[in-house]
């Protein structure tokens, strides 16, 4: 049963919690060789919003950890566990998804992935106020070593996420300089809520399409890919300069058409 719970973490992650390698930045604040960086895993963030707003902001269960991973990668101190690595672990286990998981199982997955730190959290939106909480675990000891939280107006989500990243870095064994903090705060994906939600809804759709293709359900996968394209286009309507959405849309355009 424990292994099944461990696999559940992997399935949740594979369905929408890890940023794609292509979405991660190339330029970093610190020039540390890749082999010397700290391995780190970021799990999904639970949407704890009230029912009337939960569905609207559901894409941020994927989006917030993706933004966090992008910012942590941009520091140049961490190796973020990739989606492909999680698929490798899942293939090695060869079990089926059942039930929900707790933090103990999540830490166990971190060990399998050879991560040093594990991040998980949740967010809540009430009356246009956004609160994001994150917990930091040491995979080696299996205990929580820190926590951080930010609260503010939802239209400042991009600033809140970056403040959260800055707040958690101390638990990850580093302290950013004033200049590094300033540069991190200035590197904003988008300031548009609608653009962000549409983009990450598209990314979630692509993840689900990948799973369907593996299952041989190509017709449904094609529908999801078309939905993803529409979401990326909608994101760019809200923010024409949204580089992540542009890359996602360009990736679809360059992809080899599915043979049905």
Tell me what each language-model feature is.
Residues 1-4:
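Positively charged n-region of N-terminal signal peptides that target proteins for export
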Residues 6-15:
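Bacterial N-terminal signal peptides
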Residues 17-38, 129, 140-260:
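C-terminal/domain-edge helix-coil "capping" segments
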Residues 29-103, 119, 123-127:
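Short beta-strand->alpha-helix linker/helix-N-cap micro-motif
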Residues 49, 68, 72, 76, ...:
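Sec/Tat-exported extracytoplasmic proteins
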Residues 53-65, 83, 99-103, 112, ...:
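Solvent-exposed, acidic/flexible segments
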Residues 60, 64, 68, 77, ...:
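Stable alpha-helical elements in mature extracytoplasmic
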Residues 96-141, 207, 243, 247-252, ...:
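Surface-exposed short loop/turn segments
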């Amino acid at each position: 049963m424990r292994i099944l719970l461990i696999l559940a973490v992997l399935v949740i992650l594979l369905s929408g919690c890890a940023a794609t390698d292509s979405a991660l930045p190339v330029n970093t604040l610190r020039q540390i060789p890749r082999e010397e960086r700290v391995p780190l895993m970021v799990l999904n963030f639970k949407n704890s919003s009230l029912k009337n707003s939960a569905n609207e902001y559901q894409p941020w269960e994927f989006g917030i950890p993706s933004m966090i991973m992008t910012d942590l990668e941009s520091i140049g101190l961490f190796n973020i566990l990739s989606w492909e690595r999680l698929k490798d672990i899942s293939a090695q286990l060869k079990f089926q998804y059942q039930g929900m998981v707790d933090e103990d199982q999540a830490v166990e997955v971190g060990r399998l992935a050879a991560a040093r730190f594990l991040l998980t959290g949740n967010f809540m939106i009430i009356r246009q106020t956004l609160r994001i909480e994150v917990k930091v675990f040491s995979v080696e000891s299996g205990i929580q070593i820190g926590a951080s939280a930010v609260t503010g107006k939802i239209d400042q989500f991009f600033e809140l996420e970056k403040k959260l990243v800055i707040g958690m870095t101390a638990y990850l064994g580093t302290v950013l300089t004033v200049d590094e903090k300033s540069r991190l705060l200035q590197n904003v994906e988008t300031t548009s809520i609608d653009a962000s939600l549409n983009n990450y809804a598209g990314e979630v759709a692509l993840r689900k399409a990948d799973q369907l293709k593996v299952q041989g359900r190509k017709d449904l996968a094609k529908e999801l890919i078309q939905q993803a394209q529409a979401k990326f286009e909608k994101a760019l309507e809200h923010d024409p300069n949204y580089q992540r959405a542009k890359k996602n849309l360009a990736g679809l355009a360059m992809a080899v058409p599915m043979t049905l």
